[in-house]
């Protein structure tokens, strides 16, 4: 029974060797000249099978490495193109001297680094100056508020004094007008008194000639009536 099993196993091994040999012949493209009976060296089929798998793996690895190499080349090409574009833009942004006609990548990067440091220093100075100006503006605003307080009070006080002076002046002018009116009335009174006094004097004067003669009396009467 065990012998039959060994024979079956041997036949399976021979069939496997035959199939592998056919596969190798198809891969290399030529017919095999081996005899149909296996040789004693080919009775063990596992090492050739391992070699076949290694060859398949090596061929697959070769294809994969070729694909990876082409991908890497494409990426490297794109990277170089992007780097060239960035360098061209950097030439536009960096102030270069007129004598510099040809620039290396290292020299261009060094100039860009120096230019960036210069811009950072200028930005720090501008920020410091801006802070000083803001501080000075706040101080001046506070000082203006301090000065506007007393000035506003002084202005209100001067306005009140000016209004008081103007009111006093108007009162004095009003009193002067009243005094002028009273003086004017008094002048009229004096005129009346003077008229009365003159009339009385005329009467007294006319009474004297009336004592002496009738002609004098009549003339005095005429004068009195004319004066009236």
Swiss-Prot record:
Domain bHLH span(s) in chain numbering: 67-119
UniProt feature, compositional bias: Basic residues: 43-56
Keyword line: Disease variant, DNA-binding, Nucleus, Proto-oncogene, Repressor, Transcription, Transcription regulation
InterPro entries linked: bHLH_dom, HLH_DNA-bd_sf
Effect of residue 152 to A: In prostate cancer
Cited PANTHER family: MAX DIMERIZATION, MAD, MAX-INTERACTING PROTEIN 1
Protein name from the UniProt record: Max-interacting protein 1
Regions that span the bilayer: none
Compartments in which it is found: Nucleus
Nucleus recorded as keyword: yes
Segments of this protein annotated with the region Disordered: 29-76, 161-228
Name of the gene encoding the protein in the UniProt record: MXI1
Lineage: Eukaryota, Metazoa, Chordata, Craniata, Vertebrata
Major localisation: nucleus
Disease linkage: Prostate cancer: A malignancy originating in tissues of the prostate. Most prostate cancers are adenocarcinomas that develop in the acini of the prostatic ducts. Other rare histopathologic types of prostate cancer that occur in approximately 5% of patients include small cell carcinoma, mucinous carcinoma, prostatic ductal carcinoma, transitional cell carcinoma, squamous cell carcinoma, basal cell carcinoma, adenoid cystic carcinoma (basaloid), signet-ring cell carcinoma and neuroendocrine carcinoma.
Subunit comment: Interacts with SMC3. Efficient DNA binding requires dimerization with another bHLH protein. Binds DNA as a heterodimer with MAX. Interacts with RNF17.
GO CC list: chromatin; cytosol; nucleolus; nucleoplasm; nucleus; RNA polymerase II transcription regulator complex
Tissues and organs where the protein is expressed, per its UniProt entry: High levels found in the brain, heart and lung while lower levels are seen in the liver, kidney and skeletal muscle.
């Amino acid at each position: 029974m065990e012998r039959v099993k060994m024979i079956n196993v041997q036949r399976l091994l021979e069939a496997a060797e035959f199939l592998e040999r056919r596969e190798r012949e198809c891969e290399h493209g030529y017919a095999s000249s081996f005899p149909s009976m296996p040789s004693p060296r080919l009775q063990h089929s596992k090492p050739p099978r391992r070699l076949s798998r290694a060859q398949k793996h090596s061929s697959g690895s070769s294809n994969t490495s070729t694909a990876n190499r082409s991908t890497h080349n494409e990426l490297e090409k794109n990277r170089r193109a992007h780097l060239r574009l960035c360098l061209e833009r950097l030439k536009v942004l960096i102030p270069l001297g007129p004598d510099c006609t040809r620039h290396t990548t290292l020299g261009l990067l060094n100039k860009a680094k120096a230019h960036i440091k210069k811009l950072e220093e200028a930005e720090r100075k501008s920020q410091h100056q801006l802070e000083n100006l803001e501080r000075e503006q706040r101080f001046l605003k506070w000082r203006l508020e301090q000065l506007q307080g007393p000035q506003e009070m002084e202005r209100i006080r001067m306005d009140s004094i000016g209004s008081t002076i103007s009111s006093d002046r108007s009162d004095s002018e009003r009193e002067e007008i009243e005094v002028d009116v009273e003086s004017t009335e008094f002048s009229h009174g004096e005129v009346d008194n003077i008229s009365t006094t003159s009339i009385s004097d005329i009467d007294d004067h006319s009474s004297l000639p009336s004592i002496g003669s009738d002609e004098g009396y009549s003339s005095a009467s005429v004068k009195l009536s004319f004066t009236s």
